[in-house]
């Protein structure tokens, strides 16, 4: 994190909090260009147990989604820590996913995304819905964000969107040649 902090400083990041030292978990916080408070804490320095590698009850986490007004501008802001574009979609709303040091960071112009949120893939819709009902979590079915089948409100207020599959799907190329023979009759 100390190395990233130096790079971020070189790129004009203005930290609200910065604590870097040899014998502590390095930590920093700042606000992004859309006003979201971001806090980064040094990664663990121990090996995780095999049990901890399993998916959560929500399924497999695949993205931290941030609502942005201008995806390209936000991408420029995040470039010092998220240099690799993983996937991009322009329609129906612009959405870019970057590798932010092994954290998939999504930047979305979707009006349905109100705050930073976590996205999960879960093929067991019935099982998950039974679990959230049993636990009494606050949910919204079909919340309108990228085809999620449910939005679960965590106790501290974070929204967890759950999808049957990754909404950006597999990469594909669009043929824009205009040649009608490209389309079967």
Which sequence ranges carry the predicted segments?
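Vicinal oxygen chelate
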Residues: 1-34, 68-73, 117-159, 163-165
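A short alpha-helix capping/helix-coil boundary motif
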Residues: 11, 53-55, 106-109
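Glycine-rich loops and low-complexity Gly/Arg-rich segments
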Residues: 19-20, 41-43, 64-67, 88-92, ...
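Core segments of cupin and vicinal oxygen chelate
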Residues: 20-26, 58-59, 65-103, 134
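Short, well-ordered, mixed-charge alpha-helical segments that flank or form enzyme active sites
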Residues: 25, 37, 47-49
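Conserved short beta-strand elements that form part of the metal-binding/catalytic scaffold
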Residues: 31, 37-45, 83-122, 144, ...
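N-terminal beta-strand motif that seeds the catalytic metal site of vicinal oxygen chelate
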Residues: 41-76, 80-81, 113-118, 166-185
């Amino acid at each position: 994190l100390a190395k990233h902090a130096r790079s971020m400083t070189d790129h004009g990041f203005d930290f609200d909090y910065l604590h870097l030292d040899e014998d502590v978990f390095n930590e920093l916080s700042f606000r992004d260009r859309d006003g979201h408070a971001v806090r980064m804490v040094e990664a663990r320095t121990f090996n995780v147990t095999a049990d901890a590698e399993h998916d959560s009850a929500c399924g497999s986490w695949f993205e931290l989604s941030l609502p942005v007004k201008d995806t390209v501008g936000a991408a420029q802001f995040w470039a010092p820590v998220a240099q690799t574009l993983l996937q991009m979609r322009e329609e129906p709303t612009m959405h870019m996913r970057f590798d932010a040091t092994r954290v998939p960071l999504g930047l979305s112009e979707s009006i349905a995304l109100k705050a930073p949120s976590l996205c999960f893939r879960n093929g067991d819709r019935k099982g998950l819905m039974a679990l959230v009902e049993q636990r009494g979590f606050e949910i919204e079915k079909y919340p309108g964000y990228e085809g999620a089948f449910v939005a679960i409100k965590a106790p501290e207020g974070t929204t967890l969107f759950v999808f049957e599959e990754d909404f950006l799907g597999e990469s594909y190329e669009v043929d824009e040649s205009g040649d009608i023979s490209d389309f079967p009759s």
